[in-house]
Amino acid sequence: MYRTRSSDEVATLTDPTSSSDVATSADPTSSSAVTTLVDPTTSVVISTSVDQTSSSDVATSVDPTTSVISSTSADPTTSADSTTSTVQTTSVDPTSSVVSSSSADLSSSVISSSSADPTTSTVQTTSVDPTSSVVSSSSADLSSSVISSSSADPTTSTVQTTSVDPTSSVVSSAPVDPASSVVSLTSSYPTSSSTVTISANSNGSATLTAQTTSIDPVSSIVSSSGATTIISSASIDPASSVVSSTSSEPTSFIVSSTSVYSTRPSGPTTSTDLATFSDTIILRVSTTSTSQDTQTVSSSLTDMVSSTGSADLSVSSIQRSQVDPSTFAVSNSPVYPTASTGSTSTGIPIASESLSLSRQQGISATSSSSIVTLTPVDSASSSRSSATSIIKPNMPVSSNDSKTQSSVSVVDTFQSTKSSYPSITSADPTTLASENGLVGSSSSAHPITLDRTYASAHASVTDIVSRVTDSTRHTTLVTSNINIQSEVGNLNYSGPKDTTITKQSAFMTSPASTSTISNVQSTASVMNHSIEDNISATASLESVSGTSTKDYSSQSSAIHYTNSFTTTTTNAFITSKHSIAAVSTGAITSSASISLIMEGSANIEAVGKLVWLAAALPLAFI
């Protein structure tokens, strides 16, 4: 009635029409079915395997005439990505050992192919976009590590070639017009963006990369140029660790030069020397322009200098020169001092500075009763912020008591921000022709000043508004560590008796002045000052707790002057029994504000309060 088949039985089907033999074997153990098709006419063997578990379909064809093995796989769960609709095909020619792969993106109809020839170590990649008929090809020569790419646009007959040399990190790009055989390195439009990066370290390597992009508003052609507009030099003296690097970009706004000097320890200089030095400068300049004639120029400069090891870097300084984008005036920044100590580490000055200039010119049109009124509007804003931190290392404090060890570390932080927002609105459009424009100066107290000349017949300025904000913050953080081998405590207690007291004092001064001038009316304020003390102690004593609170406030007011001062002191000491970590904290906060007013009355008020709570055992060692 029934016939039992083996698990690996092979079924053969012969098609007399095509003279092809089809063999199928099913292995239920692995849930895979293998189908083999032999065409005696072309002697081509086609083998297909279907894995029911992963729904994978793998087809392999072998042509004995050319010995070409082509394999394609389509896995609906992994290989076929419906999100990107990308098909990947790879073929290997064993005769020439050339690997060629092509991918088709069905969403954008972009066909790209790449081939690798191991004989010449050249990788060729070609992509065709049928939408725009743009053919782009790139080749990489592995022997010389030079990467070059080119794109051809048949519409404009323009060939764009870009090459990168990793050895010198030089990026060169030039568009070529075959019709006129003209090679253009720059665009007729001013530079829209520029990035300059300089990095150097102690092993004698220095890298300079620059990228400049130009946009032609007429043809909307984006052209980029690299080191063609850069004159750079960087050198490092390993013996003295002197790093000097300069860069000049004549077509852009910034000319920057940096020199870093640092002494090395006496003795022979070896590769295992712990003293390392690195200097990284990142300078970015960007300019944007729109049809409304709005221009924004911003630049940021970040200096990061680090030094580690046992070297005595007693001489360390940074000299920076910067060119103002508006006036092209060279300004030299002050030298940032560092700690001059004989300890195992040195001060690490960190400085950052950013400048933003913005100007907007336009004409506003208002219509009323079929009458159009044109009003020119000219406004500008400037913002400059800088921050400098000087970290001094732990400085041991000598003491005759062998049971006491103390160290002090100081951190100074300077933060400064200036902003200016002047604007002028004139009711007469003819006055715009006689204006001298805005003049920006990075060294003046107000980064942007107004210098305008109006004809006597058109002196009809309706409103002048100028607002300047100047904020400077100076923070000094002093950390003191005192280790005491205390003999105070329970004599029957055999635990640790070491006591560590850490005190952090933060002195913060934040004078922030804001002045607004509108129709010959001005206001100005403020000044803030605060001191914070944090004390922490670790000890192995009995339970000790205490709280100290002191409040003090005073306010005095007079004509054209207002002064308020507030001081708050809070001390809390907590020590638990048989504990290694016992924390005590304290804080002192004081603030002062000064305001200038037109009218006022005298008022003086002072409030003082002192509260002290202590447990049975006071802290005798504090």
Swiss-Prot record:
Residues covered by region (Disordered): 1-35, 47-200, 374-405
Regions of compositional bias (Polar residues) in chain numbering: 14-35, 396-405
Upregulating conditions: Induced by pheromone. Down-regulated by RIM101 and inositol.
Name of the molecule in the record: Pheromone-regulated protein PRM7
Lineage: Eukaryota, Fungi, Dikarya, Ascomycota, Saccharomycotina
Residue ranges, compositional bias (Low complexity): 47-199, 379-389
